[in-house]
Amino acid sequence: MSRIGRLPITIPAGVDVTIDGDRVSVKGPKGPKGQLEHSLPTPITATLEEGQVTVARPDDERESRSLHGLTRTLISNMVEGVTNGFSKQLEVVGTGYRVQAKGQDLEFDLGYSHPVPVKVSQGITFTVEGNRVTVAGIDKQQQVGETAANIRKLRRPDPYKGKGVYAGEQIRRKAGKK
């Protein structure tokens, strides 16, 4: 049995979990769109009993074992997302590098000949404080992490000067010419 998969997911107050066949829906207090859905993989089943969701698998095949822990973690992240939400912080570092909020979207000046716009996707909010950008939302695995990764990809950290967009990372600096 998977060590992660066998743990039950406790449902906090104010969160409504619905299991309909192979679909798991989670509704919560986080915003008007505080609902997430997940389709269960074929061999995996989920049951709702006494305020807890339990994920089970029918056999010990390799694919079933790997999907067991994954499914339990995805459902747990959905419950966490609709109650507290997720956020990632990014920092813009470099001379002349800046970020500005244009309505709900962002505009980066990253040393290119043109400003780089970033459109907000549905369910994501941006907060700009100086050179820090906070990406927040309820869907961890897709929206928040992917949006933060796409913003970081605009200007990856430079190993020589440490300039770029990154999130609290320790940049491994290289020595320049001698």
Curated annotation (Swiss-Prot):
Query: InterPro entries attached here?
Result: Ribosomal_uL6-like, Ribosomal_uL6-like_a/b-dom_sf, Ribosomal_uL6_a/b-dom, Ribosomal_uL6_bac-type, Ribosomal_uL6_CS
| Coiled-coil parts of chain | none
One GO MF annotation is: structural constituent of ribosome
Q: Which GO terms describe its biological process?
A: cytoplasmic translation
Question: What are the alphabetically sorted keywords of the record?
Answer: Ribonucleoprotein, Ribosomal protein, RNA-binding, rRNA-binding
Judging by the UniProt lineage, the source's domain of life is: Bacteria
> What's any one GO cellular component for it?
cytosolic large ribosomal subunit
Q: What does this protein do?
A: This protein binds to the 23S rRNA, and is important in its secondary structure. It is located near the subunit interface in the base of the L7/L12 stalk, and near the tRNA binding site of the peptidyltransferase center.
State the similarity comment: Belongs to the universal ribosomal protein uL6 family.
Entry's NCBIfam families? L6_bact
**Partners and quaternary state?**
Part of the 50S ribosomal subunit.
Q: This protein is called what?
A: Large ribosomal subunit protein uL6
The gene coding this protein: rplF
